[in-house]
Amino acid sequence: DERHKYAIMDPNLVPKYAVLDPKLTVSMPKFVTATTGIDALTHAVESYVTWAYNNNASNRNAEEAVVKIFRNLKRAYEDGNDLEAREAMLIASYKAGLAFNHTGVGYVHAIAHAMGGIYNTAHGLANAVIMPIVLEDYGTAVHPQLAHLAEITGVKTTGSDAEKANAFIAAIRQMNREMGLPT
């Protein structure tokens, strides 16, 4: 048993339509809500900080996704019947998908895929643990992007790019803690 996890991509796999019905998500367990929400956040953040292939459209989709996730993930986690939060999370996930479909993802997903293949770690859980570490490791290269995300989410609107970037990473860790995910 080789224990590999592979991504498959083909234009024939792209649906023509997507139905985003929040009622279909209300029965999701809290753990699944938390980890799939963090996976969507990872898609958006990785798309936003990548230098390869990003453009105004992918950045706009990533920004919209990050803002919606910061505003709604904890609400959806705490009250699975909150259809407004659930709908916002569906739209955020969709927008994050549009963003990373154009740009790709980065080291967080590379590591998370390996962990899933080797250790059967839930993908979103691996992302939750790894994302803050990888974002810190990227250092100053991503401070401007993370600073902007801190500003638009209201995490931190004053200070240097480094201070805002670090506050954004800390906010991700706090979100994880509040949903019972390891940090």
What residue spans do the PLM features occupy?
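Carboxylate- and glycine-rich phosphate/diphosphate-binding segment that chelates Mg2+/Mn2+
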Residues: 2-103
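Short, functionally important structural connectors and interaction interfaces within domains
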Residues: 5-6, 11-12, 16, 20, ...
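Amphipathic alpha-helical segments in well-ordered regions
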Residues: 44, 48, 72, 114, ...
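Amphipathic alpha-helical interaction segments
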Residues: 60-64, 88-91, 110-113, 129, ...
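Charged/polar positions within long, soluble alpha-helices
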Residues: 74, 98-101, 105, 136, ...
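Glycine-rich phosphate/pyrophosphate-binding beta-alpha loops
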Residues: 94-127
